[in-house]
Amino acid sequence: MSSNEKRFPEGFLWGGAVAANQVEGAYNEGGKGLSTADVSPNGIMSPFDESMTSLNLYHNGIDFYHRYKEDIALFAEMGFKAFRTSIAWTRIFPNGDEEEPNEEGLRFYDDLFDELLKHHIEPVVTISHYEMPLGLVKNYGGWKNRKVIEFYERYAKTVFKRYQHKVKYWMTFNEINVVLHAPFTGGGLVFEEGENKLNAMYQAAHHQFVASALAVKAGHDIIPDSKIGCMIAATTTYPMTSKPEDVFAAMENERKTLFFSDVQARGAYPGYMKRYLAENNIEIEMAEGDEELLKEHTVDYIGFSYYMSMAASTDPEELAKSGGNLLGGVKNPYLKSSEWGWQIDPKGLRITLNTLYDRYQKPLFIVENGLGAVDKVEEDGTIQDDYRINYLRDHLIEAREAIADGVELIGYTSWGPIDLVSASTAEMKKRYGFIYVDRDNEGNGTFNRIKKKSFNWYQQVIATNGESL
């Protein structure tokens, strides 16, 4: 197949992706309540701090709440076809359990989506993205409590009804599998002494699966032409050697993630997970009708983030020297790493796309991919981020190869098209954007926006539908 025959499909959703809690700021404006992000000053992998006495960059983000028109104009200049963001749950239901929504919060997203549509940019909306109401954590125990399903369903129905003529593409939970890696952020979980943590995490996941299925049902009822997806933090795992034990370990590691898309895309708990739960004394409490609900209301597409691949080993020496990758695994000696230790593997994206499509035969959407790096503003005011261009180009070329393989890929929204507060480290120094934001790790700066070299590069990629790659 010649390179001319390898192309992105017409109508491909090019764009960028953010999360409300990482960009909006205005954490206590507009009737908004406190979320888990508001008490996580050091990022999703660190202990939460309810005292709120230390610096938390999420509180002001990049001031997108007040500057979204300026930012959307820049996205439009790049030619975005789509922009993925989340609705801050606590702007709509400040404590999470209110009967009636907060009108001021609803109005903000009306204005935001109107601005996107004015510029012919399709909103892609995540209903819950690492910003669960703190009230649901403190008063109900987070997603451990089945009662939270009811609150989530009310919230989902509220936003579906409000934005039914503005938003077609939805996702129910961001990186739903992260509940196993960052349980407070992913599930609002605070463990008691002696509690079976694994049981609590998988019980929370089950409640999220049920909530997701109810959201799919409601979304299809309220917005008949809507497309409602799941979203996982995806990766591919290589065996460190051809030793059968390493190959099996790699398969098991991938299944820990694929379980979450299996349930939402296929509509049932797979056999391998039933065995895992039984062997680890994990008892999932299911209500009558749960299994039927999961079966009947599967997602329309699979959204996923991809930043890195992983390697698996059963060698104690390899395990002892592992580290760096956010989701674990051992170091792959054939790959380079980012400044934060995330191993860079464009070919792994093609493998991931093929794995997911072989498994589900549902449309796929890369909703996060990017390079977190330190950017330097030169004396002439420019930012020469060739490293970012190279990273993104290499990954997009592999995505194009996957399309040629037969994968149905509907879009690509790079992570953080404008610099934002990192989820994993809660800092500004780790930058992803095509647009630089003048703010540092201490919270100082003008918040001014500056186009990086990658801005014009991505603009050209979109204008040519990827042919300039």
Swiss-Prot record:
Function: Catalyzes the hydrolysis of aryl-phospho-beta-D-glucosides such as 4-methylumbelliferyl-phospho-beta-D-glucopyranoside (MUG-P), phosphoarbutin and phosphosalicin. Plays a major role in the utilization of arbutin or salicin as the sole carbon source. BglA and BglH are the major proteins contributing to hydrolysis of MUG-P by extracts of late-exponential-phase or stationary-phase B.subtilis cells.
This protein's name: Aryl-phospho-beta-D-glucosidase BglH
GO BP term, pick one: carbohydrate catabolic process
Catalytic activity: 6-phospho-beta-D-glucosyl-(1->4)-D-glucose + H2O = D-glucose 6-phosphate + D-glucose
Top EC category: hydrolase
GO terms for cellular component: cytosol
Keywords for the protein's UniProt record, in alphabetical order: Carbohydrate metabolism, Glycosidase, Hydrolase
Matching InterPro entries: Glyco_hydro_1, Glyco_hydro_1_AS, Glyco_hydro_1_N_CS, Glycoside_hydrolase_SF
Entry's EC annotation: 3.2.1.86
Active site as annotated: 175, 368
PANTHER family linked to this entry: 6-PHOSPHO-BETA-GLUCOSIDASE ASCB-RELATED, GLYCOSYL HYDROLASE
Family in the record: Belongs to the glycosyl hydrolase 1 family.
Induction of synthesis: Highly up-regulated by aryl-beta-D-glucosides such as salicin or 4-methylumbelliferyl-beta-D-glucopyranoside (MUG).
Domain of life: Bacteria
Keyword Transport: no
Molecular-function GO terms, alphabetical: 6-phospho-beta-glucosidase activity; beta-glucosidase activity
Membrane-spanning ranges: none
